[in-house]
Amino acid sequence: MAAMAALQSSFTSLSLSSNSFLGQRLFPSPTTLQVKTEGHSPCLIVMRIKRWERKDCKPNSLPKLHKMHVKVGDTVKVISGGEKGKIGEISKIHKHNSTVIIKDLNLKTKHVKSKEEGEQGQIIKIEAAIHSSNVMLYSKEQEVASRVGHKILEDGRKVRYLIKTGEIVDTPDRWKEIQNKKESETAVAVAA
């Protein structure tokens, strides 16, 4: 604070506007600044400008994909955040940053500009992503949220199950149902 006040007072005494240095650095990146305070010994303040951090990448520059405990089509309950306690079905997952999109939950308002002349802009509601750690698998039959476990069945299949209820989440019939739903949605989108 004191350093900023000193800088502003020096600008006024030099009759320079603060816009004179727009786009230029006043100090090198890691800056050390001596601040003198009355009655105390001078202290050293080290400032570091934080750079934009990239996501972890593989050697071929593709992002690292995280393992997720949920899949598309799972019924989940939101356990933290603004939508806490609500139940929905996962419509999309993003493995690069461990987020999920749940149908009709976490709706955000987006203002869309007009693309052509004479066309009006729109205000639309879109489903925003929720971090996967903020959702829990949900059993519709017993109406309880549970952590997920993995086990190998007698026929050699590795499946996910709900720890509280023992209910198996991954079944071949359920997977076919999800695939058929996805195909019908793409067919409707192409027809429109």
UniProtKB/Swiss-Prot annotation:
Record-stated family: Belongs to the universal ribosomal protein uL24 family.
Cellular component GO terms, alphabetical: chloroplast; mitochondrion; ribonucleoprotein complex; ribosome
Pfam families named in the record: KOW, ribosomal_L24
Complex formation: Component of the chloroplast large ribosomal subunit (LSU). Mature 70S chloroplast ribosomes of higher plants consist of a small (30S) and a large (50S) subunit. The 30S small subunit contains 1 molecule of ribosomal RNA (16S rRNA) and 24 different proteins. The 50S large subunit contains 3 rRNA molecules (23S, 5S and 4.5S rRNA) and 33 different proteins.
Taxonomic lineage from the root: Eukaryota, Viridiplantae, Streptophyta, Embryophyta, Tracheophyta
GO terms of biological process kind: translation
NCBIfam families hit by this protein: rplX_bact (TIGR01079)
MF terms in GO: rRNA binding; structural constituent of ribosome
Coiled coil: none
Keywords recorded for this protein, A-Z: Chloroplast, Plastid, Ribonucleoprotein, Ribosomal protein, RNA-binding, rRNA-binding, Transit peptide
Name of the featured protein: Large ribosomal subunit protein uL24c
InterPro entries associated with the record: KOW, Rib_uL2_dom2, Ribosomal_uL24, Ribosomal_uL24_CS, Ribosomal_uL24_KOW, Translation_prot_SH3-like_sf
PANTHER family: MITOCHONDRIAL RIBOSOMAL PROTEIN L24
UniProt keyword annotation of Secreted present: no
Compartments, as annotated in UniProt: Plastid, Chloroplast
Function comment: Component of the chloroplast ribosome (chloro-ribosome), a dedicated translation machinery responsible for the synthesis of chloroplast genome-encoded proteins, including proteins of the transcription and translation machinery and components of the photosynthetic apparatus.
Transit peptide location on this chain: 1-47
PROSITE patterns on file: RIBOSOMAL_L24
Designated gene of the protein: RPL24
